[in-house]
C-alpha cells in the first residue's frame, strides 16, 4: 500500500507544470497564524479514504478536517490537486535542523537524490512572492525582503546526502527500499518524526537571512545572530559606533541624511577631555580649602566653583588639560568624607565667559606654505608645550595650534600676533572649544530650524551655532582629532549635490523659486572661531553667495534663533521680507524704494541660515572694528554670546562697502512713517550703542536718555545680547504678524522720532556698554528687531516684571542691610522695612513685640492696612533714632518667626527708600491717608528730650489729597507719590521695586 500511494502521488506530480510547483512556495514565509488549519477536504486524497495500510511515514497518514496538528496538513500541500498556487510546499522543510537526521533511514536513502537539484531550484525560485497567491508561478521579488532570496537558495542551499529527507522530492523516492527496515506503528514515533520535520519559526527565519551557511547549522549559532533585521532588513542593531561611521555614507534614504542617522538618540562622541571637571557626590561639609588642596596636587587651578556644594557638586577648572586628565584618573571613585567622588569632564557652555573662550587653541592665518609643522612647533613651542598642530582642510595657509596650557596659548597670542614669519604677517586668534563636536551634535536639530522657520525653545540649540548636513554626507569626514577641538575635513565635496537632493525631497517644487546663484539653504555659523570658519570657508563661498537675491520668499515672520544677530551682505541685511518684490529693490540699493521697503516690513532674519560667503574682514574697517581684535567672524556675521570679543576702532570710517540706502542715504520719509530712527551723522554710528541685557518677551533694552536727547538717530544699531532670551522684544510687532502686538513703535516715544523704549525700564537702569561689549551691527531702519512672540500675554507680563527685577539687581543690593557696614560706620541709614509680618498683626501687636527689647530706639512706625479686608499687607516701616540701634534690632527680628498666630513667616529686614523722620513726615502729611482712621496712620514718637519714646501727634499737611476712589493698602487712597514709601519693598520678595497694587500698598 505505501508503494501504491507514493506511485499515485508520483503520477500526480508528473501532470504538474514546473511553474506550479514553483508557485507552491509563494506563501512559504507566512506567519504561523496563516497556516490554514483544517482547510483540506478529504476528497483531495481519494486513495487514502478507507485505507488500512501501514503508514510508514507521516505523508501517508490521512488527516481529518480540523486536525490539531497543522504541520501534518502542511506536508500534504504539495500534492493537493486544487489551488496549486496557494499550497504550502514540503520544501518548507528546507529550513530544518540537523535533528532531521533522526528520521528512520530506510524510506529515505542517499541514492534517492537523483534529479533533486533541478527540482529544488525551480521550487525555490518562487519561494518568496509578496505574500499573494501566484498561480502562474511568476517570480516576484517585492516580498518580505528586497534582496534576491532566490540567489540565496541557489547558492547556499546545496544539500548533501546527509540531508536526504529535506533535500529530495517526494516524487523521486524509490519505494523499493520501504520494506527493508519496517517502521513501528506508534503515535509516539509518528509525532516525533513530524516534530523533527517541522522547524520552529526562529530556525525558519534564521536559515533564510543568515547568508552564512547551510540551514542545518543554524542551531550552532548564537540566537542574537538570528535577528531578522541584522543583515536582511537593513536595520543594524547593537553595532559598533565606529562601524556606523564608516558605513554611514549612503545609508540615509530620506534626503536629510544625518537627521535620521546615528546622530539622533545616540552618543556619537564619548566624554571628551576638558580642563574643567564636574565633581559630583561631594559632601557638603567639605571645606573649600580642602577641595583646593586635594585638586591642586595635580596642577594649578584656574577656578574653583563651590557655590552648589550644598547640592552635592563642585567644578574645578585647570589651566593645563593634563592636570584635569590626571585628576580625573586618580580621584575617580576615591572617597572624600565617606563619599566616593564621581568626576566627569565639563565642556563650557556655548556662551562662555571671556576667560573660557580661549581653551588653549589658537588659529594661525596667512601662514607661508613653505613653513612646516615642525617649523611652527619650534616657533610656538617657546611659549609652552604644544599638544597638536593641525592643518585646516582646503585652507593651506591656515593652521590650528593647540597647547596643553591655556596660559601658553595666551602668551603666544600676545607675542606673535601680527608678527612677520617667513615674510608674511601672520594673524592669530583664539578658538572656541569643540567646534567639530558641536557640529555633529547640532547637525540634525539645527538644519531645518534655521532655514525653514522652526525654532525649538529650551534646547541646547538655542544658544549654539546652527550646523547642517544633507543627504549622503559621509559622517566619517567630520572628525575630532583632538581632545577638545576638532577639524572638519572634506565636507565641501558632495555637499552641494546632497543639499539639492534634500531640497527636492523635503520641499518639492521649491527649487523653481530659488535663484540659481543661491547654492544652498544651509546655515553654518560660528561663534568667533576660526577653527570652524577656516574649515568652512570654502563651503561658505558656495553655500551662501546671495548675489543680490533674497532668501526663499516665505511670507510672515522670519525664524528666530536666540543668541544670534543678523547678517549683512554688501551693506544690506539678509532677511525674509513681507514683500519680496519691494525687498529685491531694497537689496539693489535703490534709494527711492527704501522707505517703501521698510514699510513693507523687511524683517531681520535673526539667526538665519544664510551665508553670504564673504569674510568679515572685508567690512571690518567699514564697521569700525579693529582687525587686531581678539576675535572676528569670517563668512558669517552671527555673534553667539560673544560680542565682547570685538574692539572698537575709533579711527575706522563708518561706511558700508556698497551703496547703502539705509545708512548714508536715508530717504525723506517722515520718521513716524518709517517706524525707525532718523538719519544721524555716521560718526555717531558706533558710539550710539543700544545695549540689550537680559531681554525677555515684550521688553526693550535700557536706553541712555542722553542718546535720545541728541534728537538724531542712526540707521543701523549695535546691539549686545549676552542674555538674549527667546521671544525678546516680541511685543514690538507689525501688522501682518498675528502673533505680535500691533503696537506702532513711534507711538511709544514720539519725542524720539519713532524710536522705541520699553516703558518698564526705569532711568536707574539706563547706561551704555563699554566698547568691548559692542557686538554685530543690526542693519535696518527699525531700532528693534521684530521677533516672533512665543508665549502668552500672561507669560509676557511675567517676563516683563522679571526683566525689570533682573535689570535692577544692582539697585536691589543698595537696600540690603549689612551689619558690618553699620558697625564700621559706613552706613548711616536709619529707616528699615520689616517684611513677612503675619497679616493678622495690628499696630498694637507689632509695637508690643518691638517694645519688649527696643522701646525708645525708634521714632516712627507705620503698618500699612488693606482697608478692604482690614488686615495689614505684610510689611511695616520703622525709623531708628540711631544707626547703631539697627544692630540689636536686626539680631532680634531678622530670620526669626513671629510668636502669635502660629505663623510660619520668618521676619526679614531691609532698608527703606525714604530715609529719615523728617522725610517720612513730609511724605505722609499731605497724603489721603490723613483722612483715614487715626489707627491707620503712621505713628510718631519723640526722638529726644524728656519725652523721648512717647507718642506725638502726626502733623497734618495743608494740601491733603482727597481719596482716589479705590482701596489702597497704606491709606486706601494714596496716590503714586504717597505709595512710594511702601514701594521700597512692597512685598516680601523684592527690594526697591515700586508697586502700586492695592494689596501692596
Swiss-Prot record:
Compositionally biased spans, kind Polar residues: 978-994
Regions of compositional bias (Basic and acidic residues) in chain numbering: 793-803
CDD domains assigned: RRM1_MEI2_like, RRM3_MEI2_like
Keywords carried by this UniProt record: Repeat, RNA-binding
Gene Ontology terms, MF aspect: RNA binding
Residues covered by the RRM domain: 275-348, 360-433
Region described as Disordered: spans on this chain: 100-120, 767-815, 941-1001
Purpose of the protein: Probable RNA-binding protein that may play a role in growth regulation.
Stated name of the protein: Protein MEI2-like 4
Lineage: Eukaryota, Viridiplantae, Streptophyta, Embryophyta, Tracheophyta
Amino acid at each position: 500500500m505505501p508503494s501504491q500511494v507514493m506511485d499515485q502521488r508520483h503520477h500526480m506530480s508528473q501532470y504538474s507544470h514546473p511553474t506550479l510547483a514553483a508557485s507552491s512556495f509563494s506563501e512559504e514565509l507566512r506567519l504561523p497564524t496563516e497556516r490554514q488549519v483544517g482547510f483540506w477536504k478529504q476528497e483531495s486524497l481519494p486513495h487514502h479514504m478507507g485505507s488500512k495500510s501501514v503508514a510508514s511515514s507521516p505523508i501517508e497518514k490521512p488527516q481529518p478536517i480540523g486536525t490539531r496538528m497543522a504541520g501534518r496538513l502542511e506536508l500534504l500541500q504539495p500534492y493537493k490537486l486544487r489551488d496549486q498556487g496557494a499550497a504550502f510546499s514540503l520544501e518548507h522543510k528546507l529550513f530544518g535542523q540537523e535533528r532531521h537526521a533522526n528520521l528512520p533511514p530506510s524510506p529515505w536513502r542517499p541514492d534517492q537524490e537523483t534529479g533533486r537539484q533541478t527540482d529544488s531550484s525551480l521550487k525555490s525560485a518562487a519561494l518568496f512572492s509578496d505574500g499573494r497567491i501566484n498561480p502562474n508561478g511568476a517570480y516576484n521579488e517585492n516580498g518580505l525582503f528586497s534582496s534576491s532570496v532566490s540567489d540565496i537558495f541557489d547558492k547556499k542551499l546545496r544539500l548533501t546526502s546527509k540531508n536526504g529527507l529535506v533535500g529530495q522530492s517526494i516524487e523521486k523516492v524509490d519505494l523499493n527500499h520501504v520494506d527493508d527496515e519496517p517502521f513501528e506503528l506508534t503515535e509516539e514515533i509518528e509525532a516525533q518524526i513530524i516534530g523533527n520535520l517541522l522547524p520552529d519559526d526562529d530556525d525558519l527565519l534564521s536559515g533564510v537571512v543568515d547568508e552564512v551557511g547551510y540551514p542545518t547549522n543554524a542551531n550552532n549559532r548564537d540566537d542574537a545572530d538570528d535577528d531578522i533585521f541584522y543583515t536582511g532588513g537593513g536595520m543594524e542593531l547593537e553595532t559598533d559606533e565606529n562601524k556606523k561611521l564608516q558605513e554611514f555614507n549612503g545609508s540615509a534614504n530620506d534626503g536629510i541624511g544625518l537627521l535620521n542617522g546615528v546622530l539622533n538618540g545616540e552618543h556619537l562622541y564619548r566624554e571628551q577631555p576638558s580642563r574643567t571637571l564636574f565633581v559630583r557626590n561631594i559632601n557638603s561639609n567639605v571645606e573649600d580649602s580642602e577641595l583646593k588642596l586635594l585638586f591642586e596636587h595635580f596642577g594649578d587651578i584656574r577656578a574653583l566653583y563651590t557655590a552648589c556644594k550644598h547640592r552635592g557638586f563642585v567644578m574645578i577648572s585647570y589651566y593645563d588639560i593634563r592636570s584635569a586628565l590626571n585628576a580625573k584618573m586618580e580621584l575617580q571613585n576615591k572617597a572624600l568624607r565617606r563619599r566616593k567622588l564621581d568626576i566627569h569632564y565639563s565642556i563650557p557652555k556655548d556662551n562662555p565667559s571671556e576667560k573660557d573662550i580661549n581653551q588653549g587653541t589658537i588659529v594661525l592665518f596667512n601662514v607661508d606654505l613653505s613653513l612646516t609643522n615642525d617649523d611652527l612647533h619650534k616657533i610656538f613651542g617657546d611659549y609652552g608645550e604644544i599638544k597638536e598642530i593641525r592643518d585646516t582642510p582646503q585652507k593651506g595657509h591656515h593652521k590650528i595650534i593647540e597647547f596643553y596650557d591655556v596660559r601658553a596659548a595666551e602668551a603666544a597670542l600676545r607675542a606673535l600676533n601680527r608678527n612677520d614669519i617667513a615674510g608674511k604677517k601672520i594673524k592669530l586668534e583664539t578658538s572656541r572649544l569643540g567646534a567639530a563636536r558641536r557640529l555633529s551634535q547640532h547637525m540634525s536639530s539645527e538644519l531645518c530650524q534655521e532655514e525653514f522657520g522652526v525654532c525649538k525653545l529650551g534646547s541646547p540649540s538655542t544658544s549654539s551655532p546652527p550646523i547642517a548636513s544633507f543627504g549622503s554626507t559621509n559622517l566619517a569626514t567630520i572628525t575630532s582629532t583632538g581632545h577638545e577641538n576638532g577639524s572638519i575635513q572634506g565636507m565641501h565635496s558632495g555637499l552641494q549635490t546632497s543639499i539639492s537632493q534634500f531640497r527636492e525631497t523635503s520641499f518639492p517644487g521649491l527649487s523653481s523659486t530659488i535663484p540659481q546663484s543661491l547654492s544652498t539653504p544651509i546655515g553654518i555659523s560660528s561663534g568667533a572661531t576660526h577653527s570652524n570658519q577656516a574649515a568652512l570657508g570654502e563651503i561658505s563661498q558656495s553655500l551662501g553667495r546671495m548675489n543680490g537675491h533674497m532668501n526663499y520668499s516665505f511670507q510672515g515672520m522670519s525664524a528666530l534663533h536666540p543668541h544670534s544677530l543678523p547678517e549683512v551682505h554688501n551693506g544690506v541685511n539678509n532677511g525674509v521680507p513681507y514683500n519680496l518684490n519691494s525687498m529685491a529693490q531694497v537689496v539693489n540699493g535703490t534709494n527711492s524704494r527704501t522707505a517703501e521697503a521698510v514699510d513693507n516690513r523687511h524683517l531681520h532674519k535673526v539667526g538665519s541660515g544664510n551665508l553670504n560667503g564673504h569674510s568679515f574682514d572685508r567690512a571690518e574697517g567699514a564697521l569700525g572694528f579693529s582687525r587686531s581684535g581678539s576675535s572676528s567672524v569670517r563668512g558669517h556675521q552671527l555673534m553667539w554670546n560673544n560680542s565682547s570679543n570685538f574692539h572698537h576702532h575709533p579711527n575706522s570710517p563708518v561706511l558700508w562697502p556698497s551703496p547703502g540706502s539705509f545708512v548714508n542715504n536715508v530717504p525723506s520719509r517722515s520718521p513716524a512713517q518709517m517706524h525707525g530712527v532718523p538719519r544721524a551723522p555716521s560718526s555717531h554710528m558706533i558710539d550710539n550703542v543700544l545695549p540689550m541685557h537680559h531681554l525677555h518677551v515684550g521688553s526693550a533694552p535700557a536706553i541712555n536718555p542722553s542718546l535720545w536727547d541728541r534728537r538724531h538717530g542712526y540707521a543701523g544699531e549695535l546691539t549686545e545680547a549676552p542674555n538674549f532670551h527667546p521671544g525678546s522684544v516680541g511685543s514690538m510687532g507689525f501688522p501682518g504678524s498675528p502673533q505680535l502686538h500691533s503696537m506702532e513703535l513711534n507711538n511709544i516715544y514720539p519725542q524720539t522720532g519713532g524710536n522705541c523704549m520699553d516703558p518698564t525700564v526705569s532711568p536707574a537702569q539706563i547706561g551704555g556698554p563699554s566698547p568691548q561689549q559692542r557686538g554685530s551691527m543690526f542693519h535696518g531702519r527699525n531700532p528693534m528687531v521684530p521677533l516672533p512672540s512665543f508665549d502668552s500675554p500672561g507669560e509676557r507680563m511675567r517676563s516683563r516684571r522679571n526683566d525689570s527685577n533682573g535689570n535692577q539687581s544692582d539697585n536691589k543690593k543698595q537696600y540690603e542691610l549689612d551689619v558690618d557696614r553699620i558697625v564700621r560706620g559706613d552706613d548711616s541709614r536709619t529707616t528699615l522695612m520689616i517684611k513677612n509680618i503675619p497679616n493678622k498683626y495690628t499696630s498694637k501687636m507689632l509695637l508690643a513685640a518691638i517694645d519688649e527689647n527696643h522701646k525708645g530706639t525708634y521714632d516712627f512706625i507705620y503698618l500699612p492696612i488693606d482697608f478692604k479686608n482690614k488686615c495689614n499687607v505684610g510689611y511695616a516701616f520703622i525709623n531708628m533714632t540711631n544707626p547703631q540701634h539697627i544692630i540689636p534690632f536686626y539680631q532680634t527680628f531678622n530670620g526669626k518667626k513671629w510668636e502669635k498666630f502660629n505663623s510660619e513667616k520668618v521676619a526679614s529686614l531691609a532698608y527703606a527708600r525714604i530715609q529719615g523722620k523728617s522725610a517720612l513726615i513730609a511724605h505722609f502729611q499731605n497724603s489721603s491717608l490723613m483722612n483715614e482712621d487715626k489707627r491707620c496712620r503712621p505713628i510718631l514718637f519723640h526722638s529726644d528730650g524728656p519725652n523721648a519714646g512717647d507718642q506725638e501727634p502726626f502733623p497734618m499737611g495743608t494740601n491733603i489729597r482727597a481719596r482716589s476712589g479705590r482701596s489702597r493698602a497704606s491709606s486706601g487712597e494714596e496716590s503714586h507719590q504717597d505709595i512710594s514709601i511702601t514701594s521700597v519693598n512692597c512685598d516680601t520678595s523684592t527690594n526697591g521695586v515700586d508697586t502700586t497694587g492695592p494689596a501692596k500698598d
